[in-house]
């Protein structure tokens, strides 16, 4: 048997049952349009959009064209494999409706598929909801995202069982919170040329481990291109345990959480030519993000750090970015609980890092037992007064850090090496 590298190349493939690798390049694929008029599915809410996604997915994939208009969502649009969402840029706006919140009026056990609300006013069948409770054993927060599918008065059936106990003693609540686009266990999806608005002034917070303008979990080969993700009370774009995600030419701004959140376990993300502005953190590498690339992005005015790298985020390249006006730190290597948990073998190269933090701000801060880091050809500049500002700070526990050809201007201390000699 020939080794894989000598296998003959695939030419002129045919559509073959079960073959998800080699597919003919068809001249035309199924396309369904959604809009307020002159569309195959007429409507401007989540139900119309979901109907289009489900129709296209049932036939093996294709494109959902979102025509110009404002689409008001009472539930997430759940994506499906091999479906492309194609909007009309700034003219196609998916807007989250204001959130409601109430306590649960009766206990629900982990095997139950229903809840009882203390005040059901404003809640309706079809709504997406987020249930939260304190675990009675350890006090931790439990979260479940569900859809209301039937009701009798204040009692609502859920689309799935709870799988956690939601008891009154845990201060259990129900809120109409959800991502705008949601995807779990799907692959080969494109979201393109569309505007997503989280309506943060009228919604409570739901963090990026559960939601965002886009929230993805356990997915493969996802592309987000020319997506504007704004005003979410949480993250802009968040993907957890998702591999080979491409985010390019997107604009994530004015979210209360993270602009772009390559989440835990995500392998090989490519984040290119985007803008992340006025978020809490511009690009946040979560836990165990490896072999990623963040290049040619503009990260401006983020309240905490421009780029944050931490728990076992190894072998990533952050290069040719403009990281401007960060609230605390330009690029942060987070302190973790030991060397085995720290981020290693990452490269920060050829970035322009300008005006980082307050009077004691730091452009590049290497904390914890981070090791085998390369800081190369970065331009670090401070246009305000030097104050106590630092260009590059190496923490006391930092390991090997290679620094070469960095240009540092306008700070009080160019390099603060706190390691023991």
Where do the protein language model's features map onto the residues?
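Right-handed parallel beta-helix
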Residues: 127-165, 185-277
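Extracellular "leader-to-stem" segments immediately downstream of a signal peptide or signal-anchor
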Residues: 1-193, 197-203, 413, 420-421
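Short glycine/acidic-rich loop motifs that flank beta-strands on beta-rich extracellular proteins
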Residues: 61-62, 73-76, 90, 95-97, ...
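Surface-exposed loop/turn motifs in large extracellular/passenger domains
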Residues: 178-192, 213-225, 243-246, 264-270, ...
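Extended beta-solenoid/beta-helix repeat architectures
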Residues: 46-49, 54, 81, 208-209, ...
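The right-handed parallel beta-helix/beta-solenoid scaffold, focusing on the short coil/turn
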Residues: 62, 69, 75, 81-83, ...
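Acidic, glycine- and Ser/Thr-rich low-complexity intrinsically disordered tracts
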Residues: 2-9, 371-372, 377, 383, ...
């Amino acid at each position: 048997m020939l080794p894989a590298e000598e296998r003959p190349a695939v030419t002129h493939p045919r559509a073959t049952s079960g073959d998800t690798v080699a597919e003919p390049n068809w001249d035309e694929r199924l396309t369904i349009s959604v809009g307020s008029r002159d569309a195959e599915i007429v409507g401007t809410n989540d139900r119309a959009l979901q109907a289009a996604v489900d129709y296209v997915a049932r036939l093996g994939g294709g494109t959902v064209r979102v025509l110009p208009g404002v689409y008001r969502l009472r539930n997430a649009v759940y994506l499906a494999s091999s479906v492309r969402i194609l909007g009309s840029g700034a003219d196609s706006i998916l807007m989250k409706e204001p959130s409601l919140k109430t306590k649960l009026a009766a206990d629900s056990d982990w095997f139950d598929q229903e809840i009882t609300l203390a005040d059901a006013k404003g809640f309706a069948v079809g709504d997406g909801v987020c249930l939260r409770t304190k675990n009675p054993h350890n006090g931790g927060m439990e979260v479940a995202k569900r859809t209301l599918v039937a009701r009798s008065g204040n009692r609502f059936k859920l689309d799935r069982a709870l799988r956690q106990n939601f008891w009154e003693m845990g201060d259990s609540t129900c809120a109409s919170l959800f991502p705008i686009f949601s995807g779990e266990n799907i692959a080969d999806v494109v979201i393109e040329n569309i505007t997503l608005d989280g309506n943060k002034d009228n919604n409570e917070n739901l963090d990026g481990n559960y939601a965002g303008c886009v929230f993805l979990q356990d997915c493969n080969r996802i592309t987000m291109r020319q997506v504007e993700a704004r005003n979410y009370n949480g993250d802009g774009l968040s993907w957890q345990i998702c591999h080979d995600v491409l985010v390019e030419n997107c604009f994530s701004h004015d979210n209360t959480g993270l602009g772009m959140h390559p989440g835990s376990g995500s392998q090989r993300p490519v984040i290119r030519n985007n803008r992340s502005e006025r978020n809490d953190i511009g690009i946040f590498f979560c836990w165990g993000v490896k072999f990623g690339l963040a290049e040619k992005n503009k990260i401006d005015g983020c309240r905490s750090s421009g780029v944050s790298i931490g728990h076992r985020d190894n072998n990533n390249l952050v290069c040719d970015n403009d990281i401007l006006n960060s609230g605390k730190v330009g690029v942060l290597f987070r302190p973790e609980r030991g060397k085995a948990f720290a981020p290693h073998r990452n490269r920060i190269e050829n970035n322009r890092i300008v005006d980082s933090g307050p009077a004691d701000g730091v452009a590049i801060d290497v904390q914890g037992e981070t090791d085998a880091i390369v800081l190369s050809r970065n331009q670090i500049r401070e246009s305000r007064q030097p104050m106590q500002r630092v260009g590059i700070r190496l923490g006391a526990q930092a390991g090997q850090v290679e620094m070469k050809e960095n240009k540092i201007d306008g700070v009080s201390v160019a390099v603060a090496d706190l390691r023991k000699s």
